[in-house]
Amino acid sequence: MAKISKRINKIREGVDRNKLYDLSAAIGLVKERAVAKFDETIEIAMNLGVDPRHADQMVRGVVNLPNGTGRTVRVAVFARGDKAEEAKKAGADIVGAEELFEIVNGGKIDFDRCIATPDMMPLVGRLGKVLGPRGMMPNPKVGTVTTDVAAAVAASKGGAVEFRVEKAGIIHAGIGKVSFDNAKLEENIKAFADAVIKAKPSAAKGEYVKRVSLSSTMGVGVKVDPATVKVVA
């Protein structure tokens, strides 16, 4: 415990927890304090002025980060016939119909994103209790229920990030790796923030983006001045 506390205190050195840093400085601080022995993920948290308990204040969407996420994303596709072949050629890791349903329904989920053709949704819909809590249920609003499975697979593999506001009005997402150069991280963050702004529900009143912070997987959180991520709402 003493070693853990010492490590945390060391990481926190030089970070003013009450200060709003501009985006560039925040990225630098987070990267400098990412000392784990693996390539940590850089994560963004945005506190929004919405109450997701009300359906008309739900915030969700998908954004293609210009520089990808740095993650290897495993993609499952529910499809039959030609669409199944299309998915395989596009690089999907798992493709199937009833047999894939049985695997997932049994609790084996060896993938990060799930795509389905519209005709498969009556079957996939029965997996709501399995996929829903994991945020993996295919949804046409984020492009994961589609006839263009090749494009959906390519987007998923290439840096597409889904976001959905949580109960407390917070959105979390991984937007890159510590190994990314600062400019690429900044581009990804601004693209993500822009997508969240564009997803603002009409029912949201008052200040939309209240707080923004960055952190790494094992590192300290750094508060960011929303204006420097082009957040103007």
UniProtKB/Swiss-Prot annotation:
Record keywords: Repressor, Ribonucleoprotein, Ribosomal protein, RNA-binding, rRNA-binding, Translation regulation, tRNA-binding
GO molecular function: rRNA binding; structural constituent of ribosome; tRNA binding
PROSITE patterns, per database record: RIBOSOMAL_L1 (PS01199)
Recorded superkingdom: Bacteria
GO biological process annotation, one example: regulation of translation
Residues in coiled coil: none
A single Gene Ontology CC term: cytosolic large ribosomal subunit
Known role: Binds directly to 23S rRNA. The L1 stalk is quite mobile in the ribosome, and is involved in E site tRNA release. Protein L1 is also a translational repressor protein, it controls the translation of the L11 operon by binding to its mRNA.
Family recorded in the similarity comment: Belongs to the universal ribosomal protein uL1 family.
Subunit structure comment from the entry: Part of the 50S ribosomal subunit.
Annotated protein name in UniProt: Large ribosomal subunit protein uL1
Gene name as annotated: rplA
